[in-house]
Amino acid sequence: MKYVNVNEIAAKWNLSERSVRNYCAHGKIPGVILDGKTWRIPEDAVKPVRKKRAEKIANDLLTRLKMEKEAGIPGGIYHKVQIELTYNSNHMEGSRLTHDQTRYIFETNTIGIQDEVVNVDDIVETANHFRCIDQIIELANYPLSEAFIKQLHYILKSGTSDSRKTWFAVGEYKRFENEVGGSATAKPADVSGEMRNLLKRYNLSKQKTLKEIIQFHYEFEKIHPFQDGNGRVGRLIMFKECLRNGITPFIIEDDIKEFYYRGLKEWKNEQGYFMDTCLTAQDRFKVYMDYFGLEYRD
């Protein structure tokens, strides 16, 4: 058998001499001989295939959500957020779908409901809410705008019975007065101006605090810009803005929804109610993040 030296193999394989010596020392090239301090390598040796380094799994929430969404990975944090946020936010607005039914729709894209009368809108809005979550993940780093907010409403309400009503403006601001919790909201003629002013004030600072995000939510719900769907759109916005600003997001679950409503009602006089509710929800979300090995700063 004919042997060659390290420099010849390095030139042949387009590698550094150091790399070739490392291959020899680690037994990656069959048949090599160490003659004193010189490696003798079979002339017909095959260049070792370098193993690709395993990609490091992102440990920040937004990157992981995007990665799992794009790869279609089941059972991860993306899967968890889709089911928990959709179920709880829709349930607050009167959806009668159970948690298991919500999960089944997400996982199988089928209904699978027997011997039960189910409102079609509950199913449509559940599927639509999944798409809304995809939207806030994809566009999380973009500044909040009227166009984005209207787009969320359009996605949420498309294909529902509301969308077939001539007076209901899907993806557009309300045409008729409405109330929230018995309290007056912005007049339809004033909504556009109030939303522009709200967004202008909010977007003055680049890095938002949790309190600023909650303040925006309070003002958004007070305006109540859409005919219906304001609560869900508002909570989606809070989740998106937490992602954008590196703040642990949160999901308002059924057992704390009354505290959430009280917090909204009392925000102007006592901000502690709403802050405490959101911090409680945040602590619960941190349990998810700990489980999936994700870091958080707050």
Model-derived segments and their meaning:
Residues M1-W13, E17-I29, L34-D298:
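FIC/Doc superfamily catalytic core
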